[in-house]
């Protein structure tokens, strides 16, 4: 069962790669592990866990559904949805999951599915339900990039009742989020995992902007989502440091000044310090910034 499930997931990975070579590293960043407790499949950012009977049934129904599920999990990782948590509100009596947590899960799923549905590749092309089309129409009214955080903000303003929330969850839920860091508050977050996916994210943006002539035609708003994500997390101070160079400038160099010799000279000769501080020092600065 382990081998069959792994074979199905590898086949999905390979089919996705044929059309989306800019995702090569992301698609190949997982090992595969059978887990009888998972609902379909899910990932923690390192391993894709699958329930063999459900995965096999999905593949027999339509392999495109497996392809979409694989890409869905990859996008969760690219945008680090697994690490998104927040202040919890009142808990539900039946399963202990907060409304806020359900809304975050739903927002992540909608954001990912919206990207997938906006991409024009045969390997993931699938008909959209009326509920899905109407949800997208309402979300797109603002005309802004629909990342998970923005979707969450809009959904919160809708004041969804239980029935509407459940209907949306059933429509957009694709994978099991139980393995996410945000679902394990007692477990220390792994900064290396977020850094790994951040670097993959950067590489994808570079590939799309530099090599993909069809970006924006077949990839929908995926590139714009990547740019938005990177802008929100990029440390521009670190970026500017790359352009700093060492040069000399006129200033007292206190760092190279030795007070021992200075005070010794004053003690020995009265008013003659043995060493004066240097009148220039090396500094690392950006010499000029040009705005165009």
Residue ranges of predicted features:
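A short alpha/beta connector and helix-capping loop motif
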Residues: 287-288
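Short, functionally important secondary-structure microenvironments
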Residues: 1-67, 74-278, 282-283
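Conserved small/polar residues in nucleotide/adenosyl-binding loops
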Residues: 291-292
